[in-house]
Amino acid sequence: MSTTPARTLDTEELEQRVKHMYQEVALEPEREFHFETGRALAERLGYPAADLDRIPAAAIDSFAGVGHFLDLADIAPGDAVLDLGSGSGMDSFLASLAAGPDGRVIGVDMTDEQLAKATRLAAEAGIENAEFRSGYIEEPPVEAASVNCVISNGVINLSPDKAAVFAAVAKALRPGGRLALADIVSTEQLPEGVTCDASLWAACIGGAMQRDRYREAIEGAGLQIVEWRENRVYRFVSERADNAVRKYGVTSISLLARHPE
């Protein structure tokens, strides 16, 4: 009796689709995507308008995050912060305000257009304590035990190797350091037809890990989850995404985890 071979995700196709998607977010943020972008989204998610007023507006235009978490990050003056999947820099710039002149923020992204935009905006705004590096979130180009806090917004779901991401987070954090993020997870395990569809991954659906497995991946890296909350105000804007939300409980969450002392 013959069996149908299991489908697998084409990770090269995934990378190209994700890069293309976020090239467009950087260059043409006014376009329609499978997800919301911009200042109205940021404010609805909970970003204070007064804070947004202090950073480059063009970075906010290309914001495509899924939740607010900087209150959990509790970034203090002098902190070193790593932003995984920093995009056009909105969260990095906000973190740089909290870290102050004695702190520093390192944003890491694999999309050249996002990196170029964030670097240009930092230079134009005179933001000297934020820099942006090309790299992958599974292997960010930072030294071990070099940061107080790792942040990420709507990006880890795009990685086909989330365990590697959380291992990299644990490696980068100093003892007692913090991981604060927003991401997409699911209540139910997504079927193969969804998890092997690179286009749905690029739309922040296909890579949504079942929430218990997501927690296990974090804890498996030696991090301790302190707080976990749902971002009920976040919504998808495509019909395919809405179907996944209804059928599999795909949702946005924010969390705080700590590296042991």
What are these regions, as identified by a protein language model?
Residues 35-80, 91-94, 98:
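Conserved alpha-helix/loop element of class I SAM-dependent methyltransferases that forms part
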Residues 185-205:
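Short, glycine-/aromatic-enriched active-site segment of Class I SAM-dependent methyltransferases
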Residues 206-228:
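Short alpha-helix
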Residues 148-161:
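A short SAM/SAH-binding and catalytic strip from SAM-dependent methyltransferases
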Residues 1-45:
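N-terminal auxiliary segments of SAM/dcSAM-dependent transferases
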